[in-house]
Amino acid sequence: MMFPGLLAPPAGYPSLLRPTPTLTLPQSLQSAFSGHSSFLVEDLIRISRPPAYLPRGSVPTPSMSPPRPGAPAALTDTGASDLGSPGPGSRRGGSPQTAVSPASEPTFLKFGVNAILSSAPRTETSPTLLQSVPPKTFAFPYFEGSFQPFIRSSYFPASSSVVPIPGTFSWPLAARGKPRRGMLRRAVFSDVQRKALEKMFQKQKYISKPDRKKLAAKLGLKDSQVKIWFQNRRMKWRNSKERELLSSGGCREQTLPTKLNPHPDLSDVGQKGPGDDDDEEDEGPGSPRPRLVYHAAPADPRHLRDPRLEAPLPTSPARSGSPDKASDFSDSEDDEEGEEEITVS
C-alpha cells in the first residue's frame, strides 16, 4: 500500500473511530438520551437498541466504561452526539475520519447494525432526505383495491397497468349466491310440435312418464319442456271450463279434485252442469210440434173468431156441434202443417 496511514487508525484518536460508544451506558444516561428532540432513524435505533446487539469481538475501551460521578459526563454526551448527529465535516468524503469505516475491520458484519449506522455509508444522504422519503403509494391511495376496477375502467384508463389486483370486487357474487336452477328460458315450439302436443292432450290430459319421454324424443324436445307444456295447457283448459261452468250456473267446487276423483274431467262436469243443453239437443228435432200445437189453439185468429160468430150454435144439438169442431180442428191442423213446412224449409 502506498498510503498505509489512511487504513491504519491513528493512535491519538482511538475513541473517535470506535462506533456505538453508548451501547454500555447506564439506564440513567439512556433516559437522558431519550429526551433528545431528534427523530432521525439513527438516533431512534441507537437509543432503543438493546445491549445484545454488541458487535462480536468488540472490547469496551476505557472511554466506554461507566463514567465516574462528577467526571466527564459531558464528554461522553458530546461523543454520543457526535455519533448520533455527526457534523458536516464528518459526512464529507474528503475528511480522514470518514475514510476508515468500521466495515473494514474483520470483526464487523457487512450488513450489521454497526455498518448500517456508521457515518461512512451515509455521506451522500442528509436528514432532510431521510425525512422526505415518500411512502409506498398505489395508483389510488384513497380507495381500496376492490373499488379499483370501477374507477380504473371509467375515469382512470391509464392506470390499469400500475397496480394489477387479481380477483378484485368479488363481493357481489357472494351476496347474490348461486344462480337459481328454476330460471329456464321460454321454449318456442314449432307448428308441428304444437299440433302433436295438442293431439296428445286431446287423448289424455295427464300424460304418463313413459309416454311423455317417447313424445319428447319424437318431437326433439326435452322431457321437462313437454311436462311444462302439459301443465300450462291443463291450466288453460281448466280455466276455460270453469268459466263455462260458472256462466251456466254451476259451482266451482265441481272442478276441484277430490279423493274419489283426483283428476276431474271438466268436460263431463260441463255437460252435467248445463243439463238444459242436453235436453234441448234431444228435443231439437221434435220441438216445434208441441210448441206449435200448444200455442196454436189460443193464438189462431180463426179459432178465436169462430166461437164468436157461431155463438147461437151452442143451442143446436151436440151432434151438429161435433162435426163443426172437428172441421175446425182439421183446419187448424192443416194450417199447422203448412206452418211446419214453412219453418222447415
Swiss-Prot record:
Composition-biased stretches, type Acidic residues, lie in: 330-345
Q: Which Pfam families match?
A: Homeodomain
Which SMART domains does the record cross-reference, listed alphabetically? HOX
Q: Where is this region: Disordered?
A: 55-103, 241-345
Q: Name one GO molecular function term.
A: DNA-binding transcription factor activity, RNA polymerase II-specific
Q: Name one GO biological process term.
A: cell differentiation in spinal cord
* Entry keyword annotation includes Nucleus: yes
Q: What is its main location?
A: nucleus
List the biased-composition ranges (Basic and acidic residues). 300-309
- Which keywords does this Swiss-Prot/TrEMBL entry list? Developmental protein, DNA-binding, Homeobox, Nucleus
DNA-binding found in the keyword field: yes
Which sections of the sequence are annotated for DNA binding?
182-241
Q: Extract one GO cellular component term from the record.
A: nucleus
- Where does it reside? Nucleus
Entry function? Could have a role in patterning the central nervous system during embryogenesis. Has a key role in regulating the distinct phenotypic features that distinguish two major classes of ventral interneurons, V0 and V1 neurons. Regulates the transcription factor profile, neurotransmitter phenotype, intraspinal migratory path and axonal trajectory of V0 neurons, features that differentiate them from an adjacent set of V1 neurons.
Similarity field: Belongs to the H2.0 homeobox family.
Stated name of the protein: Homeobox protein DBX1
Q: Which organism was this protein described from?
A: Bos taurus
- Name of the encoding gene: DBX1
